[in-house]
């Protein structure tokens, strides 16, 4: 097994344990998300601790016992079980463990949204927030200003999303803005959007059109893309008059072009060749 493969398999195993745990409605997933986020922050700060917890020379049970002693009195049983299970696994880099714990925190919050029936809203809100940030350099600068304290950045997010978005979206964005951990805001929002889509095992299609689509058009497009890719598709609709007509669809790294502008560009290329 490669080092990269080791962390990938450890993360996959942790996600399976989280899914099994959250299948029980008795688990408070919002509290679980908070506790996992707190563990993430601690491990991110304490480099020596995370190195000990991921040291392959140390016995798995000894690392699990250490994690249990450190975290057991500070977080609940479900979070402790997840973390101790994770430190039993093999990790290629100590930072991979931190990334995985953070991912579980995000998934727990998304599970709360799914239980509440607002996961679609969260997906749409994350997408729209990303578009707003990308079109407003001053806002982006304020949200990513490392000289501002966390409380100020948290308050800024609340002023933007409080009462306008779901509690889950505000929590996820606040955590990303206050604790970016080296990620750009755009990369963090994209990662959250992908996790949200995965909650329903769906792909995300970013659809750019010259004019807004009707509900019927959205349904037909979603059905056509689902047939094409063999998986349910979530549509993020972006209206851009410069498309001129038709639409542009991006699924992951694949782009499906069907706009007038693209056909004009193709014609220009053929004439120039």
Curated annotation (Swiss-Prot):
It comes from the Bacteria. One of its GO terms (molecular function) is proton-transporting ATP synthase activity, rotational mechanism. The keyword Aminoacyl-tRNA synthetase does not apply. Keywords: ATP synthesis, Cell membrane, CF(1), Hydrogen ion transport, Ion transport, Membrane, Transport. One of its GO terms (cellular component) is plasma membrane. The keyword Cell membrane applies. PROSITE patterns: ATPASE_DELTA. It is found in: Cell membrane. Disulfide bonds: none annotated. It is a peripheral membrane protein. F(1)F(0) ATP synthase produces ATP from ADP in the presence of a proton or sodium gradient. F-type ATPases consist of two structural domains, F(1) containing the extramembraneous catalytic core and F(0) containing the membrane proton channel, linked together by a central stalk and a peripheral stalk. During catalysis, ATP synthesis in the catalytic domain of F(1) is coupled via a rotary mechanism of the central stalk subunits to proton translocation. F-type ATPases have 2 components, F(1) - the catalytic core - and F(0) - the membrane proton channel. F(1) has five subunits: alpha(3), beta(3), gamma(1), delta(1), epsilon(1). F(0) has three main subunits: a(1), b(2) and c(10-14). The alpha and beta chains form an alternating ring which encloses part of the gamma chain. F(1) is attached to F(0) by a central stalk formed by the gamma and epsilon chains, while a peripheral stalk is formed by the delta and b chains. Belongs to the ATPase delta chain family. This is ATP synthase subunit delta. The gene is atpH.
């Amino acid at each position: 097994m490669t080092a990269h493969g080791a962390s990938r398999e450890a993360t996959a195993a942790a996600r399976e344990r989280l899914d099994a745990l959250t299948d029980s409605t008795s688990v408070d997933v919002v509290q679980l998300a908070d506790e996992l986020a707190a563990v993430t922050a601690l491990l991110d700060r304490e480099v020596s601790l995370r190195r000990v917890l991921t040291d392959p020379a140390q016995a798995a049970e000894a690392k699990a016992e250490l994690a249990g002693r450190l975290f057991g009195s500070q977080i609940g049983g479900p979070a402790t079980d997840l973390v101790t299970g994770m430190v039993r696994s093999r990790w290629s880099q100590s930072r991979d463990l931190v990334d995985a714990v953070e991912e579980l925190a995000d998934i727990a919050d998304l599970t709360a949204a799914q239980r509440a029936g607002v996961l679609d809203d969260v997906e749409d809100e994350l997408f729209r927030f990303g578009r707003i940030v990308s079109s407003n350099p001053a806002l982006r600068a304020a949200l990513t200003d490392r000289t501002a304290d966390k409380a100020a950045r948290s308050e800024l997010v609340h002023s933007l999303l409080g009462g306008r978005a779901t509690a889950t979206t505000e929590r996820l964005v606040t955590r990303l803005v206050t604790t970016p951990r080296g990620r750009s805001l755009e990369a963090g929002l994209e990662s959250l959007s992908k996790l949200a889509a995965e909650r329903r095992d769906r792909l995300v299609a970013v659809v750019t059109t010259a004019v807004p689509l009707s509900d019927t058009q959205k349904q037909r497009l979603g059905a056509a893309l689902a047939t094409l890719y063999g998986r349910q598709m979530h549509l993020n609709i972006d209206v851009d008059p410069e498309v001129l007509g038709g639409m542009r669809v991006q699924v992951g790294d694949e782009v499906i072009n069907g706009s007038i502008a693209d056909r004009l560009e193709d014609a220009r290329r053929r004439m120039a060749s």
